[in-house]
Amino acid sequence: MKVVEVKHPLVRHKIGLMREGDISTKRFRELAAEVGSLLTYEATADFETETVTIEGWNGPVEVDQIKGKKVTVVPILRAGLGMMDGVLEHIPSARISVVGIYRDEETLEPVPYFEKLASDMNERIALIVDPMLATGGSMIATIDLLKKRGCTSIKALVLVAAPEGIKALEAAHPDVELYTAAIDRCLNEKGYILPGLGDAGDKIFGTK
């Protein structure tokens, strides 16, 4: 599985700011979108382009345009919504496919509760966004769902990943690509990433 830890200075700086324990909801939300935007830039670097001729201000001009499959952004509810605008900033025409999954706090297993996917998933590149890759359960369940709908090109964008989650994701779906702003140390006994960001969903939405 292709794993890319984006080490650009801006990404490292912004993730560092997100780790502050007393960060405000407004600031955390802004940074989640900003880092999501930077991850999108990295994840789309291999998109193919084609040269087309358009009518410019002074006559015909050749320009490059992205070709191939169209994109669908797949936020995993609810926290994934915090990264979605960062993706749409670069790909405003992308379709939005929503997957609702929560983690059972007792078993740490993913529990699906909602889905609304683009009707032509087999023709699209899916960019899944979720702030945390902890155990990997929610991400694996989401990819299972997308593949059942015919999607064959999938990239996952996360703010922070745990080694345990990366290992689980690779075992389940070695054909996907993972882009993360940071690979952290480990999970604690409750399945939270250390040092992590805390509960990203609570911090993005300001609710518990």
From Swiss-Prot:
Molecular function in Gene Ontology: GTP binding; magnesium ion binding; uracil phosphoribosyltransferase activity
GO biological process: UMP salvage; uracil salvage
Tree of life domain: Bacteria
Pathway terms, separated by semicolons: Pyrimidine metabolism; UMP biosynthesis via salvage pathway; UMP from uracil: step 1/1
Pfam families, per database record: UPRTase (PF14681)
Annotated catalysed reactions: UMP + diphosphate = 5-phospho-alpha-D-ribose 1-diphosphate + uracil
Function: Catalyzes the conversion of uracil and 5-phospho-alpha-D-ribose 1-diphosphate (PRPP) to UMP and diphosphate.
CDD domains in the cross-refs: PRTases_typeI
Recorded family membership: Belongs to the UPRTase family.
EC number: 2.4.2.9
Database matches in NCBIfam families: PRK00129.1, upp
Record key words, sorted: Allosteric enzyme, Glycosyltransferase, GTP-binding, Magnesium, Nucleotide-binding, Transferase
Cofactor note: Binds 1 Mg(2+) ion per subunit. The magnesium is bound as Mg-PRPP.
Residues reported to bind uracil: 193, 198-200
InterPro entries the UniProt entry points to: PRibTrfase_dom, PRTase-like, Upp_B, UPRTase/APRTase, Ura_phspho_trans
Species: Shewanella sp. (strain ANA-3)
Cofactor(s) required, per the database record: Mg(2+)
Regulation of its function: Allosterically activated by GTP.
Protein name as annotated: Uracil phosphoribosyltransferase
Residues involved in 5-phospho-alpha-D-ribose 1-diphosphate binding: 78, 103, 130-138, 199
